[in-house]
Amino acid sequence: MGVRECPALLLLLSLLLPPLGLPALGAPPRLICDSRVLERYILEAREAENVTMGCAEGCSFGENVTVPDTKVNFYSWKRMEVEQQAVEVWQGLALLSEAILQGQALLANSSQPSETLRLHVDKAVSSLRSLTSLLRALGAQKEAISPPDAASAAPLRTFAVDTLCKLFRIYSNFLRGKLKLYTGEACRRGDR
Protein backbone atom coordinates (compact mmCIF):
# COMPACT_ATOMS: atom_id res chain seq x y z
CA MET A 1 0.00 0.00 0.00
CA GLY A 2 1.63 3.23 -1.15
CA VAL A 3 1.20 6.79 0.04
CA ARG A 4 -1.09 7.59 -2.90
CA GLU A 5 -3.44 4.80 -1.84
CA CYS A 6 -3.72 6.10 1.72
CA PRO A 7 -4.29 9.87 1.76
CA ALA A 8 -5.72 9.69 5.28
CA LEU A 9 -2.39 8.36 6.59
CA LEU A 10 -0.52 11.14 4.80
CA LEU A 11 -2.86 13.74 6.28
CA LEU A 12 -2.47 12.24 9.76
CA LEU A 13 1.33 12.25 9.48
CA SER A 14 1.39 15.85 8.24
CA LEU A 15 -0.67 16.89 11.27
CA LEU A 16 1.31 14.91 13.85
CA LEU A 17 4.90 15.51 12.76
CA PRO A 18 5.15 19.32 13.20
CA PRO A 19 4.00 19.34 16.88
CA LEU A 20 6.64 16.69 17.59
CA GLY A 21 9.30 18.97 16.15
CA LEU A 22 9.81 16.75 13.12
CA PRO A 23 9.69 18.07 9.58
CA ALA A 24 6.42 17.40 7.80
CA LEU A 25 6.45 15.49 4.56
CA GLY A 26 6.95 17.90 1.70
CA ALA A 27 7.99 20.73 4.05
CA PRO A 28 10.26 23.28 2.38
CA PRO A 29 13.94 23.02 3.36
CA ARG A 30 14.06 26.66 4.48
CA LEU A 31 14.14 26.13 8.22
CA ILE A 32 17.03 28.59 8.55
CA CYS A 33 14.67 31.31 7.28
CA ASP A 34 12.77 31.09 10.57
CA SER A 35 14.60 33.70 12.67
CA ARG A 36 13.99 31.67 15.85
CA VAL A 37 16.20 28.87 14.54
CA LEU A 38 19.26 31.07 14.05
CA GLU A 39 18.53 32.92 17.30
CA ARG A 40 18.70 29.60 19.16
CA TYR A 41 22.19 28.95 17.80
CA ILE A 42 23.26 32.51 18.62
CA LEU A 43 21.95 32.13 22.18
CA GLU A 44 23.92 28.90 22.65
CA ALA A 45 27.08 30.58 21.33
CA ARG A 46 26.61 33.53 23.70
CA GLU A 47 26.07 31.18 26.65
CA ALA A 48 29.32 29.39 25.81
CA GLU A 49 31.11 32.73 25.51
CA ASN A 50 29.74 33.85 28.90
CA VAL A 51 30.74 30.59 30.60
CA THR A 52 34.31 30.89 29.33
CA MET A 53 34.74 34.60 30.14
CA GLY A 54 35.71 33.99 33.75
CA CYS A 55 37.67 30.87 32.96
CA ALA A 56 41.41 31.05 33.41
CA GLU A 57 42.45 27.48 34.07
CA GLY A 58 41.64 24.95 31.38
CA CYS A 59 40.50 27.56 28.83
CA SER A 60 43.87 28.24 27.25
CA PHE A 61 44.83 26.07 24.29
CA GLY A 62 48.59 26.33 24.58
CA GLU A 63 48.68 26.88 20.82
CA ASN A 64 46.95 29.13 18.33
CA VAL A 65 43.75 28.20 16.51
CA THR A 66 42.89 29.93 13.22
CA VAL A 67 39.45 31.56 13.00
CA PRO A 68 37.72 33.78 10.44
CA ASP A 69 37.70 37.54 10.87
CA THR A 70 34.12 38.45 11.75
CA LYS A 71 34.27 42.17 10.97
CA VAL A 72 31.70 43.26 8.42
CA ASN A 73 31.91 46.40 6.32
CA PHE A 74 28.18 46.79 5.72
CA TYR A 75 28.65 49.02 2.67
CA SER A 76 30.89 46.44 0.99
CA TRP A 77 28.68 43.56 2.11
CA LYS A 78 25.55 45.11 0.56
CA ARG A 79 27.38 45.65 -2.73
CA MET A 80 28.75 42.11 -2.79
CA GLU A 81 27.13 39.53 -5.05
CA VAL A 82 25.14 36.93 -3.10
CA GLU A 83 27.49 34.25 -4.44
CA GLN A 84 30.50 36.03 -2.92
CA GLN A 85 28.61 36.38 0.37
CA ALA A 86 27.95 32.64 0.26
CA VAL A 87 31.67 31.99 -0.29
CA GLU A 88 32.59 34.09 2.76
CA VAL A 89 29.97 32.44 4.94
CA TRP A 90 30.79 28.93 3.76
CA GLN A 91 34.55 29.40 4.22
CA GLY A 92 34.03 31.04 7.61
CA LEU A 93 31.75 28.24 8.76
CA ALA A 94 34.25 25.61 7.60
CA LEU A 95 37.10 27.39 9.39
CA LEU A 96 35.05 27.78 12.57
CA SER A 97 34.12 24.09 12.47
CA GLU A 98 37.78 23.20 12.13
CA ALA A 99 38.71 25.54 15.00
CA ILE A 100 36.02 24.17 17.33
CA LEU A 101 37.08 20.59 16.54
CA GLN A 102 40.69 21.56 17.22
CA GLY A 103 39.58 23.17 20.49
CA GLN A 104 37.66 20.01 21.36
CA ALA A 105 40.77 17.89 20.78
CA LEU A 106 42.96 20.24 22.83
CA LEU A 107 40.39 20.24 25.63
CA ALA A 108 40.25 16.43 25.60
CA ASN A 109 44.04 16.32 25.96
CA SER A 110 44.12 18.74 28.89
CA SER A 111 44.79 17.34 32.36
CA GLN A 112 41.38 18.13 33.91
CA PRO A 113 38.87 19.53 31.46
CA SER A 114 35.74 20.98 33.02
CA GLU A 115 32.55 19.08 32.26
CA THR A 116 30.79 22.39 31.57
CA LEU A 117 33.44 23.43 29.05
CA ARG A 118 33.29 20.05 27.36
CA LEU A 119 29.49 20.33 27.14
CA HIS A 120 29.64 23.76 25.47
CA VAL A 121 32.31 22.65 23.00
CA ASP A 122 30.31 19.52 22.14
CA LYS A 123 27.19 21.66 21.66
CA ALA A 124 29.13 23.99 19.35
CA VAL A 125 30.34 21.03 17.26
CA SER A 126 26.76 19.79 16.93
CA SER A 127 25.41 23.27 16.18
CA LEU A 128 27.97 23.89 13.45
CA ARG A 129 27.05 20.59 11.80
CA SER A 130 23.38 21.53 11.94
CA LEU A 131 24.05 25.00 10.54
CA THR A 132 26.06 23.46 7.73
CA SER A 133 23.11 21.22 6.85
CA LEU A 134 20.67 24.14 7.03
CA LEU A 135 22.87 26.21 4.72
CA ARG A 136 23.10 23.31 2.28
CA ALA A 137 19.29 23.15 2.21
CA LEU A 138 19.23 26.89 1.50
CA GLY A 139 21.64 26.41 -1.41
CA ALA A 140 24.63 28.23 0.07
CA GLN A 141 27.06 25.47 -0.86
CA LYS A 142 26.00 25.57 -4.50
CA GLU A 143 26.44 29.36 -4.57
CA ALA A 144 29.80 29.11 -2.83
CA ILE A 145 31.15 26.49 -5.24
CA SER A 146 30.46 28.52 -8.36
CA PRO A 147 30.92 32.22 -7.68
CA PRO A 148 30.57 34.37 -10.81
CA ASP A 149 34.19 35.52 -10.81
CA ALA A 150 36.23 33.17 -8.62
CA ALA A 151 39.49 34.79 -9.70
CA SER A 152 38.50 38.13 -8.19
CA ALA A 153 37.34 36.62 -4.89
CA ALA A 154 39.32 38.02 -1.99
CA PRO A 155 40.85 35.43 0.33
CA LEU A 156 39.12 34.96 3.65
CA ARG A 157 40.69 37.13 6.35
CA THR A 158 41.72 35.14 9.40
CA PHE A 159 43.53 35.51 12.69
CA ALA A 160 44.56 33.28 15.57
CA VAL A 161 43.07 32.81 19.04
CA ASP A 162 44.52 30.92 21.99
CA THR A 163 41.60 30.59 24.44
CA LEU A 164 38.12 29.12 24.44
CA CYS A 165 36.69 32.51 25.40
CA LYS A 166 38.13 34.16 22.28
CA LEU A 167 37.03 31.21 20.13
CA PHE A 168 33.45 31.39 21.40
CA ARG A 169 33.41 35.18 20.97
CA ILE A 170 34.37 34.75 17.31
CA TYR A 171 31.80 31.98 16.92
CA SER A 172 29.06 34.18 18.41
CA ASN A 173 30.08 37.21 16.33
CA PHE A 174 30.16 35.15 13.13
CA LEU A 175 26.64 33.85 13.71
CA ARG A 176 25.29 37.30 14.62
CA GLY A 177 27.15 38.98 11.75
CA LYS A 178 27.94 37.36 8.43
CA LEU A 179 25.73 34.29 8.82
CA LYS A 180 22.67 36.30 9.88
CA LEU A 181 23.21 38.86 7.10
CA TYR A 182 23.63 36.18 4.45
CA THR A 183 20.67 34.04 5.50
CA GLY A 184 18.47 37.11 5.82
CA GLU A 185 19.26 38.17 2.26
CA ALA A 186 19.04 34.64 0.84
CA CYS A 187 15.67 34.08 2.51
CA ARG A 188 14.34 37.46 1.30
CA ARG A 189 15.28 36.59 -2.26
CA GLY A 190 13.04 33.56 -1.92
CA ASP A 191 14.01 32.07 -5.27
CA ARG A 192 15.44 28.85 -3.89
UniProtKB/Swiss-Prot annotation:
Q: What SUPFAM superfamilies does this protein's entry cite?
A: 4-helical cytokines
Tell me where on the tree of life, at the top rank, the source sits: Eukaryota
Name of this chain's protein: Erythropoietin
Query: Which coarse location class applies to the principal site listed for this UniProt protein?
Result: secreted
InterPro entries, sorted:
4_helix_cytokine-like_core, EPO/TPO_CS, EPO_TPO, Erythroptn
Q: Where in the cell is it found?
A: Secreted
Q: Which family does it belong to?
A: Belongs to the EPO/TPO family.
Q: Name one GO cellular component term.
A: extracellular space
A single MF term (Gene Ontology): cytokine activity
Quote the PROSITE patterns the UniProt record gives: EPO_TPO
Cysteines joined through disulfide linkages: 33-187, 55-59
| Key words of the record | Disulfide bond, Erythrocyte maturation, Glycoprotein, Hormone, Secreted, Signal
Which species is this record about?
A: Equus caballus
The answer to whether keyword Disulfide bond applies is yes
User: What role does it play?
Assistant: Hormone involved in the regulation of erythrocyte proliferation and differentiation and the maintenance of a physiological level of circulating erythrocyte mass. Binds to EPOR leading to EPOR dimerization and JAK2 activation thereby activating specific downstream effectors, including STAT1 and STAT3.
Give the positions annotated as glycosylation sites.
50, 64, 109
Among the record's GO biological process terms, what is one?
A: erythrocyte differentiation
